[in-house]
């Protein structure tokens, strides 16, 4: 009875374990893989800080609009009291006693607050221009972030479909293994039957092919392990789930290659690098305008409040006599401020103008580089398309060749060498076709990226 219970328990645990493994294997599509990898990317988190810093500069510029300069100073300490020998004076008239002296036996806490503030009223639009320059700078930072993101998305595209390619190659090798086993059985049968048509030199060639085939299998196995480990890393797989691509077969993407001028025009309109340089140029130009306006006199509203209190130091009644240890005073008014560091401002303007020219030249250089990049990727994609088409035709021919050699061998008219050659060629072309499909998809993704076209359009198509 106990043995039955133990056996049932073991069976249940094994079944539960099998279910858990099945539940932990998750197949995800490219968009899910891409979004999760981007969310976990330390590189993207690092680049995002540049965007947040640029957005913080907008807040700093906007803060100059409302009371940009407010200051509070406090002073605290112990001070002695005062005493006077004149009995005809009230405490608030002690300033009239020329013989007034400190009372070192009477100590009290001294407290003083000084509050001052300045509010811009009219600055010729210098603050608004500074805010606009900061906003354009943040826009440039966002475009730079998008450019880095596009680079990472391209690498993730290759990584996702590398897994699909590895799965395809594994299946092809399994099919090839079945054919290798079939030929090996036939050779063994011929040996047992003492068939004189069996050429030992052909057997040696087959044994060599088997060894080479085992090397291929080992390479594929290690590549698969590498891809899986890389997937686990980019997806931050801390829950122990097994992630696999939802796409199980590697086929050419459905998008067609457009004329080259389509990608050139798209690149000039969509590339985030060009948008970042353009926004940076506008930001520099706006900043120069702000600097020029800062060189003009500005109208400000300023005010202050001073308060001091010391219990043993009475406040004096004469407004012209202030007791610095016991007072309450304040005021406000308009003021005109003019910066007199003209040489420094002029140097800043000249430096900004140099940066403005630099931004213009950078755009021209970037356009030249992008044009060459688009043309190069267009050439690679077009060539990859031809390779896929021709390899597919060659594979069809190799399948007919292998079928014919298999029939000849089965009827005793063929040779092992010819059958092995046909089988090797078919496997070689199958692997080559999948590799070239992967290269075609990758080259088309690079072409789209160089044109500023989102990679997700390839998957959608």
Language-model features: where?
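Acidic, low-complexity, intrinsically disordered peripheral segments
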Residues: 23, 78-82, 432-461
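Amphipathic, heptad-repeat-like alpha-helical segments
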Residues: 42-49, 161-182, 210-224, 274, ...
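Alpha-helical hairpins and coiled-coil heptad-repeat segments
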Residues: 184-203, 400-420
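Sec/SRP-type N-terminal targeting helices
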Residues: 45-49, 63, 121-149, 199-201, ...
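Periplasmic alpha-helical coiled-coil/stalk elements that build and connect Gram-negative outer-membrane
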Residues: 28-32, 149-266, 425-426, 443
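Bacterial N-terminal signal peptides
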Residues: 8-17
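Sec/Tat signal peptide C-region and signal peptidase I cleavage site
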Residues: 18-22
